[in-house]
């Protein structure tokens, strides 16, 4: 049972790391490359978010994480991205 919890924790940690990586990628892109209205920005964001959602779905389907935990990861990232987007568009 301890091994199962360890695997579940590892899956949750990895999903959080991936969410943080997306947030960092968008921060760098906004700081150095482009504005939020740019189609490239939208494409990168959509692709990354879609990929993370698929990871969350996969982990939930395997029983590695609870679906609610997955929703929390996605919601946290969406909130952070919204704050970041708002900060850059209100400059």
From Swiss-Prot:
Gene3D superfamilies: SO2669-like. InterPro entries: UPF0358, UPF0358_sf. NCBIfam families: PRK13666.1. Belongs to the UPF0358 family. This is UPF0358 protein Sca_0738. It comes from Staphylococcus carnosus (strain TM300). The lineage of its organism: Bacteria, Bacillati, Bacillota, Bacilli, Bacillales.
